[in-house]
Structure formats: structure tokens, C-alpha cells
């Protein structure tokens, strides 16, 4: 069984036991979160149902790799280098359930 969930403006294809990195969620480590924005669920047949819930456990709150932003204008000696590290939450999917 797999599901497509939406969190942080992005969509993720998940199944039970998978580990994903998402935009930062307001949750503590080892806390269980419910994701209600489920696009579709499949168990050998596709079901676009709005009453599905995905439960996940927060494994870690950390920061992602550094992203480098480099601006340049040729022949003008204009160069700017900047970068940042995005905050992320690492989740383990524990359960995908359809509510009736």
C-alpha cells in the first residue's frame, strides 16, 4: 500500500516504513504526527479519497545541505556568493489508513 501526501508545498510518494525529509514541522523528536493532506492511496487499485490519514514518527529535526547561490555579470567584475541551510524534519511513515 502506498500514498501520495502533501506537506510543505511538496508531494511525496510514501509507503509504510519509508523515511522522508520534509520542510520543518512544529513537532518534537519521537513524537507522532498525522498528515491529513493525502492526495491518493493505492492498494492494488488507485483511490483518490479524502478520508485517508498517514501517521508518521519524527526521527530528527535538523538542517539540510548548504545551498549555494552565485550571481555574476560578465565583464563587470560583479560576483556575489551567498548560501543557506534549510531546516528539515526527518519522518518515518508508520501507518497509512483509510477512515470510514
UniProtKB/Swiss-Prot annotation:
Protein's UniProt keywords contain Membrane: no
Keywords linked to the UniProt accession: Ribonucleoprotein, Ribosomal protein, RNA-binding, rRNA-binding
A GO MF term: structural constituent of ribosome
PROSITE patterns: RIBOSOMAL_L21
SUPFAM superfamilies assigned to the protein according to its UniProt record, in alphabetical order: L21p-like
Domain of life: Bacteria
GO biological process, one term: translation
Any one of the GO CC terms: cytoplasm
Keyword RNA-binding among UniProt keywords: yes
Pfam families: Ribosomal_L21p
Family, similarity comment: Belongs to the bacterial ribosomal protein bL21 family.
Stored HAMAP family: Ribosomal_bL21
Known function: This protein binds to 23S rRNA in the presence of protein L20.
UniProt subunit comment: Part of the 50S ribosomal subunit. Contacts protein L20.
Identification of the protein by name: Large ribosomal subunit protein bL21
